[in-house]
Amino acid sequence: MARDITFLTVFLESCGAVNNDEAGKLLSAWTSTVRIEGPEPTDSNSLYIPLLPPGMLKIKLNFKMNDRLVTEEQELFTKLREIVGSSIRFWEEQLFYQVQDVSTIENHVILSLKCTILTDAQISTFISKPRELHTHAKGYPEIYYLSELSTTVNFFSKEGNYVEISHVIPHFNEYFSSLIVSQLEFEYPMVFSMISRLRLKWQQSSLAPISYALTSNSVLLPIMLNMIAQDKSSTTAYQILCRRRGPPIQNFQIFSIPAVTYNK
């Protein structure tokens, strides 16, 4: 069963480069939806993980300019695709995915991400087999797979289809960084939280020895995995509040491109 969850639309604004030029003002409206695959939702614990190989997590974007669809044939689409492609380093180095492909399908730019931390075999070891063996155990999470993050952005400019790419990039970075920090890290930490995914990467080899040392069986594996996911100290918001010195743990300059002006 697949279900979609849509976040509230966010509006951003930036002025022209010269003396807050009103004519060069750029507005944008962003709406994102995540697709969840799994059983019917219940009141029990839910553990959200990325769609695992051979499946892949899709980051999908499409663009509008003054309410008109930006199509693959337009030069603006090409430059926006380059901006999306510039985020590969973020997904690979900070969230530990492999970007398998950056494709264009039906006027959408799609990043295909392969999870490098979890596999189906590990989910079987950590969740499925303990649930089969320990039917009496309580507090086990239900597994749901996040298969897609889809975003539609509508840019508004007083100058028609004229847009300066250097003004677009801050909108991309501000929106996606705020979406991750305020929503995705809290709701889907095993998918979008750098610290949660890093902790899982470091600790997954220790989970079975700890469970067997404490109980002589695998009964604690699902509970410990869920504890990593539910630890709110893994969120960027918590790290910002508690970290008084030093550089930010996560770099949210996700997108970049040379500042060039296009008019098409």
UniProtKB/Swiss-Prot annotation:
One of its GO terms (cellular component) is nucleus. Residues 200-221 are annotated as: Leucine-zipper. Pfam families: REC102 (PF21736). It is found in: Nucleus. GO terms for biological process: meiotic cell cycle. InterPro entries: REC102. Keywords: Meiosis, Nucleus. Despite weak sequence similarities, may correspond to the subunit B of a SPO11-containing topoisomerase 6 complex specifically required for meiotic recombination. Retains some of the structural features of the ancestral archaeal Top6B subunit (AC O05207). Interacts with REC104; seems to form a functional unit with REC104. REC102-REC104 interacts with SKI8-SPO11 and this interaction is required for proper subcellular location of the proteins during the initiation of recombination. Interacts with MEI4, REC114 and SPO11. Belongs to the TOP6B-like family. Required for formation of the SPO11-mediated double-strand breaks (DSBs) that initiate meiotic recombination. May mediate the interaction between SPO11 subunits during meiosis. Also needed for homolog chromosome pairing, synaptonemal complex formation, and for the proper timing of the first meiotic division. Not required for mitosis and mitotic DNA repair mechanisms. This is Meiotic recombination protein REC102. The lineage of its organism: Eukaryota, Fungi, Dikarya, Ascomycota, Saccharomycotina. The gene is REC102.
